[in-house]
Amino acid sequence: MTKVDDALFEHGASAVAVEQNNGRDNPTKPKDANICRHLKLAAHHIPHHLAVAVQQGKGKSFANLTYQELDFISLNKQSDAIAFALNAYGLTRGMKAVLMVTPSLDFFALTFALFKAGIIPVLVDPGMGIKNLKQCFIEAAPDAFIGIPKAHIARRLLGWGKASVKRLINVDANQSGVTDTLSRLLTGAPSLASMLSFTTKSSSAKLPEQVEYPMALLEHDEMAAILFTSGSTGTPKGVVYSHGMFEAQIQALKQDYGIAHGERDLATFPLFSLFGPALGMTSIVPEMDASKPITANPEFLFAAIEKYQCSNIFVNPALLERLGRAGEQTDSKNQHKLSSVKRVISAGAPATIASIARFSKMLSDGVPVLNSYGATESLPISMIASDELFTTTQVTDNGGGICVGRAIDGVKIEIIAITEADIPEWDNRLCLNAGEIGEIVVTGQMVSQSYYHREKATAASKIWDSERQTFRHRMGDLGYLDDSGRLWMCGRKAHRVDATQGGQFAKRYYSIPCERIFNTHPNVKRSALVGVTVKGQHGVGEIKPLICIELDQSLVCNKSAQLYQELMVIAEQYSQTQGIRRFLIHPDFPVDVRHNAKIFREKLAVWAQSQTKG
């Protein structure tokens, strides 16, 4: 983007920016908080700049991959047309619609159309499992189901949303290779294309093509979407997102991460890719299964970065590792050099120092990998650049936790004592001192206020702050603040192990500090702390810490006894791990379905218990 274009874009947004004061410290709320206003501004000021490019198929060579593209004005017009069609189909403001569409041009246009119409998209992770998906649909009670043919077939077979769904839309885009009639027979739903055609033909004025859709005027705290957590840290819950939350996230990406209009982003996570057009940034979507990033073909991603000269990359730790390994294996003559990239954002779980260092070899000098901390309920919370993170390695390897940086501007982080009890009202006396490990509590405009129809879960994770007139969110993560205000992660509250002796509490173990100590052993790829119950004196059950070990892929351990002995020696050298004397080798750790990076310790705990005798 030229400087003139950028200035015009900023001028067009100035009224909103002044009114909201960057969406942070001014309590005044805009009368129109619909997140789609950013797309309309882009369509007006940079109409023919590329908004979205989606890779089509796998291609015969990486140099000749094809992409479908939309500029900002076309994306805006298509979303307008779809919004008109949704209204004509009986979907109106305040209704809820499940959206199960793979990353595509339709995905972008549909999502913005829903926002424009004030229809609330319900987003779920297909990998969370059949039982969890069905429960999500029961709780959300959607009015409509919008999905690709596979999603509709699953809906019919498994009864998803049967009690509430009254409107169905099939998003095929002729990808299945079947006729519209056959597709409707298989899915039980009319196609999006047929709806658009009908809406256009039924209007002599051809409204969807020639008239701008009257975007719904929404309040700052009005529900914008329901985003279900993946279930990797517990039962999936619907997080209520307001338009104000989305606005705060956009402002954080602009101000704290430095993303500017005219940039191009390699978008590897569907939800984050939607921020591109809202930021005046192009979203480049490579061919990959976003639910299984570890299966992505690195060459597709490298080719997309090269073709579109991407300046930003959003990845999770699993994909960061995969891309870094691929770059490392390339011979020197064909070494990948990502010269256009000026920032990498890693989120979803803490990336390892080794992964970051390996990936950074492909970047130009001084280009940071920005490690972000947050959750579906509140994102982003804090951030640390790779150069600073590298200086914390020794602390992490010695059981000090993982540094996740300082709070994003406008976010307040506090640490409170560990408790399972609900905390209805905030009191500053709850706060622990610097260096004390407790539960992380956050507040800010990107922090959610409730779970959808989950009153108990809301009560367990929200604390009302009467002074700020907002809820603080209990992250369910443990950590501490150092003297300079940096946050250090020590693992999930549910993953701590409170060991007992003689039926009484003996010692508390935290997952990340313990695991990072054992990960320093050269044969250990990663480790996981779990608790097992063993028989103690007089037959009383005792809870003991156990470390599950995943070996480096190049190793086959036929000397486990020797390894365990070496690990016990390591354990006794640190106060955080003293007393750990049980170890088990696991072939392949189960991981979360969304990022393929968070270790599923709950499953490991069940496995470890089955392997434990007495």
UniProtKB/Swiss-Prot annotation:
Its EC number is 6.1.3.1. InterPro entries: AMP-binding_CS, AMP-dep_synth/lig_dom, ANL_N_sf, ATP-dep_AMP-bd_enzyme, OlefBLtnSynShew. The keyword Secreted does not apply. It catalyses: a (2R,3S)-2-alkyl-3-hydroxyalkanoate + ATP = a cis-3-alkyl-4-alkyloxetan-2-one + AMP + diphosphate. GO terms for molecular function: ATP binding; ligase activity. Keywords: ATP-binding, Ligase, Nucleotide-binding. Disruption phenotype: Deletion of the entire oleABCD gene cluster leads to the complete absence of nonpolar extractable products. The oleABCD deletion strain shows a significantly longer lag phase than the wild-type strain when shifted to a lower temperature. ATP binds at residues 229-237, 371-376, 477, 492. PANTHER family: LONG-CHAIN-FATTY-ACID--COA LIGASE (PTHR43767), NONRIBOSOMAL PEPTIDE SYNTHASE PES1 (EUROFUNG)-RELATED (PTHR43767:SF1). Belongs to the ATP-dependent AMP-binding enzyme family. Involved in olefin biosynthesis. Catalyzes the conversion of 2-alkyl-3-hydroxyalkanoic acids to beta-lactones in the presence of ATP. The S.oneidensis oleABCD genes produce 3,6,9,12,15,19,22,25,28-hentriacontanonaene, which may aid the cells in adapting to a sudden drop in temperature. This is Olefin beta-lactone synthetase. The lineage of its organism: Bacteria, Pseudomonadati, Pseudomonadota, Gammaproteobacteria, Alteromonadales. The gene is oleC.
